Amino acid sequence: MYRPIRALIDCTALQHNLSVVRSHTRQARIMAVVKADAYGHGLLRTTQALNTADGFAVLELEAAIQLREAGFNQPVLLLEGFFSAEELEAIDHYQLSTVIHSHEQLSLLLAHRKTGKPDIYLKINTGMNRLGFRPEEESYVFNRIRQWRSDTSITLMTHFSCADDALEADQVNQQLDQFAALHDVKENNLPQTLANSAAILRYPGTHADWVRPGIVLYGASPLPDKTGIELGLRPVMTLTSQIIAVQQLDPSDRVGYGGQFIANQPMRIGVVAAGYADGYPRHAPTGTPVLVNGQRTRLVGRISMDMLTVDLNGISEAGVGSPVTLWGEGLPVEEVAKSAQTISYELLTALSPRVPSISIS
């Protein structure tokens, strides 16, 4: 007997969402971002469904190697680059693309004897202030790399800090202006990649040669004022479970740790096999939406490690074994995230390894 919690992964929804991205970016190539185990959806399952993408972006060298060994021949980009000379050897061997964002990485690169043709993404810090060379350093770094290997393929890259916020267009435009002013954008017409999911949707002028969609591929919105459904996307992950017990409450009965929820009338509650050890947000408050038998209801009381409780008043047919949707089909993950005062990215990527993940189509 297995606990009934499951993450159902709809691979046709992945393909649909990729087609939505293509409809927004008809000329740009698509670098599908599959870091963090494809945002919790499973790396190989996701890349197989997205096999028509023009490239993939990951964080760890191990994930990039896994894609190569699975037979993917598209460019595979390491978003944080490399951390040692040994990793550069592996990048060479597996013909991977790599970001370079620091002088430490540049020094390692220049000391490396590479046999294949290098594919470098030169990251420029235009205002995110996280990774990247300052704009005034770009020409120097570019020239050092070309002196090292004149046949090096170099793509210029930056990342927007506020593309999701409609009130921050000035910041986006300021970053875009800094990028456009780079010496080698003007002089050498280098390939460029700027747009993340939010910029793909809000700023078509940023699409350039490569776009880097992430959250939109998984059916969730990068925009705070819209859900994925409203953007024409389909949810890929549906987190489901079942009711495993029912309790009848009298007025003034309290529920869960701390007794924070107090019944103000006779009511039935269902105990659901899902908790924070499964990746459900512990701080989700009473009132967070849940579906039971496809009907909308609410969480009541605190989330426990392995269980949570839901209001069954008005759902008279619900009982032990009734299906519960925690997010996904019929219940946008953005709604749950907003109630828990977090973001959909965190919910999807925080799914626990103990939750079985099942492909559906």
Swiss-Prot record:
InterPro entries xrefs: Ala_racemase (IPR000821), Ala_racemase/Decarboxylase_C (IPR009006), Ala_racemase_C (IPR011079), Ala_racemase_N (IPR001608), Ala_racemase_pyridoxalP-BS (IPR020622), PLP-binding_barrel (IPR029066)
UniProt modified residues of type N6-(pyridoxal phosphate)lysine: 35
Annotated Gene3D superfamilies: Alanine racemase, Lyase, Ornithine Decarboxylase, Chain A, domain 1
One protein family per Pfam: Ala_racemase_N
Transmembrane segments: none
Associated pathway: Amino-acid biosynthesis; D-alanine biosynthesis; D-alanine from L-alanine: step 1/1
Record-level GO BP terms: D-alanine biosynthetic process
The entry's keywords: Isomerase, Pyridoxal phosphate
Catalytic residues, chain numbering: 35, 257
Family, similarity comment: Belongs to the alanine racemase family.
Protein name: Alanine racemase
High-level lineage: Bacteria, Pseudomonadati, Pseudomonadota, Betaproteobacteria, Nitrosomonadales
